[in-house]
């Protein structure tokens, strides 16, 4: 039997994140071969992943990253089973590492095949499922490109938002962050009325009409009043028309124009866990 040193165990632990005893067992089984021990730990991860495939992984960390020139951003969620794991510093660090890699890709499928320290992201997730003992997977994958992109991550990494602005100007970074905070807090259904799907519009009109009938309003007045209520729905639930949370006397669209008269919010992405 090969003699396994503490230094070898520690090296394997740093490389894989596995526990000390698991690393020692893998090195013993691999007769001291470092690469062989890594492979054994990966196989263990695959077995654990297969057993936990049907488990709910609604906890985790939502992370937003923006590239160096603020023209592209990405949000990923690294999902797990428990809040205990989601708050672990190593888990959050891994989520941030994944997000940095994700900036280079436009789809979740491409990202999962990307290299992560010598193995694919997908294989790393399987490995970590074995190491942590919980189902670990990538949930959301969103990208946004615009003349200027900013971000905001809410405390606890449960909500992440990207905001795209129409141009890069002095104050754009703060404006994008403030609008992202707005989206995090108020959860708008769309950027503006054009972005609200027809199903939602039809539902809101029907709810309004049903309420008006219960109030005894004449049938010939329902359409006009319902349209007024729909406009109120747009004002309350679309990002650019919402009252700005830091100054409710102006809308979000009005707020960004205080930064630059021609500045507009052109897109946003929001991911929330739980």
Curated annotation (Swiss-Prot):
Stretches the record annotates as Involved in Mg(2+) ion dislocation from EF-Tu: 82-85
PROSITE patterns with a match to the protein in the record: EF_TS_1, EF_TS_2
Cited SUPFAM superfamilies: Elongation factor Ts (EF-Ts), dimerisation domain, UBA-like
InterPro entries: EF-Ts_dimer_sf, Transl_elong_EFTs/EF1B, Transl_elong_EFTs/EF1B_dimer, Transl_elong_Ts_CS, UBA-like_sf
Subcellular location: Cytoplasm
UniProt keyword list: Cytoplasm, Elongation factor, Protein biosynthesis
Family as reported in the entry's similarity comment: Belongs to the EF-Ts family.
HAMAP family: EF_Ts (MF_00050)
Name of the protein in its database record: Elongation factor Ts
Organism: Christiangramia forsetii (strain DSM 17595 / CGMCC 1.15422 / KT0803) (Gramella forsetii)
The gene coding this protein: tsf
């Amino acid at each position: 039997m090969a003699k396994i040193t503490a230094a070898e165990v520690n090296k394997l632990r740093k490389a894989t994140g596995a526990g000390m005893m698991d690393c020692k067992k893998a090195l013993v089984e691999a007769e001291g071969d470092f690469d062989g021990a890594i492979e054994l730990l990966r196989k263990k991860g695959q077995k654990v992943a297969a057993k936990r495939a049907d488990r709910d992984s609604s906890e985790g960390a939502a992370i937003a990253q923006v590239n160096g020139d603020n023209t592209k951003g990405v949000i990923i969620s690294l999902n797990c089973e428990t809040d205990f794991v989601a708050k672990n510093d190593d888990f959050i660090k891994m989520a941030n590492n994944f997000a940095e890699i994700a900036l280079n890709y436009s789809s979740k499928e491409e990202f999962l095949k990307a290299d992560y320290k010598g193995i694919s992201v997908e294989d790393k997730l399987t490995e970590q499922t074995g190491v942590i003992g919980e189902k670990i997977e990538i949930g959301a994958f969103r990208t946004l490109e615009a003349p200027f992109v900013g971000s905001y991550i809410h405390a606890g990494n449960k909500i992440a938002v990207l905001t795209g602005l129409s141009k890069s100007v002095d104050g754009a970074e703060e404006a994008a962050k403030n609008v992202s905070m707005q989206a995090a807090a108020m959860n708008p259904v769309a950027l503006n009325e054009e972005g609200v799907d027809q199903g939602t519009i039809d539902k809101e009109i029907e709810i309004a009409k049903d309420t008006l009938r219960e109030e005894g309003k004449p049938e010939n007045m329902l359409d006009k009043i319902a349209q007024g209520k729909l406009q109120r729905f747009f004002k309350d639930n679309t990002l650019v028309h919402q009252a700005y949370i830091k100054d409710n006397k102006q809308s979000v669209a009005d707020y960004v124009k205080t930064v630059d008269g021609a500045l507009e919010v052109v897109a946003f992405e929001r991911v929330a866990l739980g």
